[in-house]
Amino acid sequence: MDILGEIVNVDEYVEKLELQKNDIGFYKCPFCDYTNADAKVVRKHVKSKHLEEIEKELKKLESQKSKNNGKKQTGQKKQGKGKKQPKRVRETCVSTQERKDYVLFFCHNHKVRLHLANGEVLEGKCCCKDPYTVLVDVGKGDVVIVNKAYIVKYVPLDLEKL
């Protein structure tokens, strides 16, 4: 029997008693085979016919409460209060310590060779201020924007500056 909340007397116990429905849709008394279509009638039946059993259950609940001194039983956890707060999004300019791919930040304003996932090779001056994309100035005023996820390999070309 699952009783919710704090039970003080027989009336509260009967009100919070969970009644099971049988296959026909009738409510069944938890102590005997009595059934009825109305839950209130079954609750009145329980209160009038099974008062001794209810008092025994209340004593058991009270003794368990005194054993635990009002503490939770082991294994019970606190329930959350609704939705979790979304994580805050940071600025697009990220410091080198915050990212795993921090090596590309050191290549900012340096000449690099990028090998992409589709087999292309790009050479040019690298600009890496954004955490997700790299700007490569390939010359003649052409700038290519590449997502960092598609970079397979990068090779710094002017090593003395790094």
UniProtKB/Swiss-Prot annotation:
Region of interest (Disordered), residue spans: 60-93
UniProt keyword terms in alphabetical order: Metal-binding, Plasmid, Zinc, Zinc-finger
Family classification: To M.jannaschii MJECS06.
Species of provenance: Methanocaldococcus jannaschii (strain ATCC 43067 / DSM 2661 / JAL-1 / JCM 10045 / NBRC 100440)
Molecular function as annotated in GO: zinc ion binding
Zinc finger (C2H2-type): 29-50
Name listed for the protein in its UniProt record: Uncharacterized protein MJECL27
Composition skew (Basic residues), residue ranges: 68-87
